[in-house]
Amino acid sequence: MKKLVLLFALVLLGFQVQADSIQNTDEETKTEEQPGEEDQAVSVSFGDPEGTSLQEESLRDLVCYCRSRGCKGRERMNGTCRKGHLLYTLCCR
């Protein structure tokens, strides 16, 4: 039952993120992105610090943010992040 509630919450969060991103599309094209309190930079790395065959050049430069209102501009949704009991959208570029 708890899994069903969690799954339902994630589905609702996905719908909310899509709705917010559609509403904010016009605003995002007019204003330049400024990191705020709601955005947190996340460094993503795969494998050893020296690099492995799994770590490609494009993955080394991946910058991700935990956003509460959906991804901006050239970012793509790559999952979710959690801060305390709140879930955020993981947006990477």
Swiss-Prot record:
Grouped into one coarse class, the protein's main location is secreted
Subcellular locations according to the entry? Secreted
Looking up InterPro entries in the UniProt record yields: Alpha-defensin, Alpha-defensin_C, Alpha-defensin_N, Beta/alpha-defensin_C
Ordered alphabetically, the record's keywords are: Antibiotic, Antimicrobial, Defensin, Disulfide bond, Secreted, Signal
Region called Disordered, residue ranges: 24-54
Query: Where does tissue-level expression of this protein occur?
Result: Paneth cells of the small bowel.
Question: Secretion signal: which residues?
Answer: 1-19
Entry-linked PROSITE patterns: DEFENSIN (PS00269)
Q: Which residues form the propeptide?
A: 20-58
Q: Provide one Gene Ontology cellular component.
A: extracellular space
A Pfam family it matches: Defensin_propep
Q: Does the keyword ATP-binding apply?
A: no
Instruction: Name the GO terms of the biological process aspect.
Output: cellular response to lipopolysaccharide; defense response to bacterium; defense response to Gram-negative bacterium; defense response to Gram-positive bacterium; response to xenobiotic stimulus
Q: Does the keyword Disulfide bond apply?
A: yes
Q: List the disulfide bonds.
A: 64-92, 66-81, 71-91
Purpose: Probably contributes to the antimicrobial barrier function of the small bowel mucosa. Has antibacterial activity against attenuated mutants of S.typhimurium.
Concerning its family, UniProt says: Belongs to the alpha-defensin family.
Report what the protein is called. Alpha-defensin 1
Organism listed in the record: Mus musculus (Mouse)
Give the gene symbol: Defa1
